[in-house]
């Protein structure tokens, strides 16, 4: 969809004049930009209900922002920023271990782990790599080819201006649709249809997929290769990449277990994502926020809290650790533009992991340009600076913080990818939190997955990942539309990539290391923060949005300074706000 309409954005320039919030080498000053409008708010929002209006006001700026991104002519060749960064980070650490002749910390390997399993089974490697691969993967080659060819064939089909406008209208007007009954009926038909379709291909005998997966994991942990492959064969007979939630769970966990056995999964990023393009990321994001409130509620809580804090501020400085594409900020920018006293000067410091190649900061620079254009539309003064480094290597001297400004540190769903003390004795995770405290912000906004699958022991980690991912697969099957390509992409980006890391990798190669909200709380308190209680009105509004707009099994709850999001009683995400213990 990046090549839908190749229209360059003209009239935007860089300058190194005064008033920048950062060093001259990466200043982003004001310039002119052409405004593209394909959405009439007055026409699309006629007579909305109060709750629907509230939902629309939260969604529309994001969809406008995505609209502008889709107009960029070089989007097709770009891959996902986070995938590239994590792949580079894992490669650097692996290379460093080789140079230093280091081995993973012993706590990360147990009797049941397979850190050295590849050497033990080297005599059987030809059998695994040829016969096993041919037996287990040939079945899905046609499905993969169909999926890829389908995606490629769809891009040229929407290259005309009329079809482009239709796609934009679908994105921008999605929050106006209030047809939950119809959507639920479609989802039900989709689930039933897919189940019937795969029942014809798979065995009709019901199986306990979780039990099979646990038995296979136990065989892997005890180095019983024969039994492990027997269980893998049984799992594959009852699983499919495009089946129901249980079949998908079995398929992808079997892939991860086989990768662990054969030792072929050293960089799970490349194997699971094949460098997902920016266009596909936008498609997945659009479908995800329509069906699941988890990410939207993280942004909603953070933005509302920041907006209340900066209600009278003349300068608001947001230091965003993990800014990615800046999807969080269009809503806040629009809210700031509506202040009675006028918008403040918005300074954003975008921090990301470096990209591979000769321009490690290229993507985070592009995010600044997009935010600049969006601020110009709403007449919000804007300054932007960027840092592309591993977070543990960033120091206070890299940041430019002025006196008298309201400073906010923001970190949403990214700290789990920072290594902990099991990778390095000087925990990069704690180092990053100490930096957050050294910034001495007026507010620290934090959100993370509530995950229990960070144990150094493989079996414990596998079991907890199995329970967590079962809930996610069930949630996506229940809520996402029948567009199988979109659902597959969302699952790949939000479940499979991390599951591959957790199951197939050890040491520095395991990049996903989530913790429970209680463990995060201990770390944050130790870094020198104290909890800031969430506004009751914000929590109330969030509950109303989820209740009116989303599936009834989504749950929003709060406990003092934490807001929890869950699915069928299981807490999946947690959001909180913090202030320095001593200002």
From Swiss-Prot:
Residues 200-579 form the GRAS domain. Residues 207-266 are annotated as: Leucine repeat I (LRI). Keywords: Nucleus, Transcription, Transcription regulation. One of its GO terms (molecular function) is DNA-binding transcription factor activity. GO terms for biological process: regulation of DNA-templated transcription. A motif (VHIID) lies at residues 316-320. Expressed in seedlings, leaves, sepals, stamen and pistil, and in the quiescent center of root meristem. Residues 504-579 are annotated as: SAW. Residues 407-501 are annotated as: PFYRE. It is found in: Nucleus. Residues 115-124 have a biased composition (Polar residues). GO terms for cellular component: nucleus. Residues 107-154, 182-205 are annotated as: Disordered. Pfam families: GRAS. PROSITE patterns: GRAS (PS50985). Residues 131-140 have a biased composition (Basic and acidic residues). Residues 285-350 are annotated as: VHIID. Residues 366-398 are annotated as: Leucine repeat II (LRII). It comes from the Eukaryota. Belongs to the GRAS family. Probable transcription factor involved in plant development. Interacts with SNRNP35 and CYP95. This is Scarecrow-like protein 30.
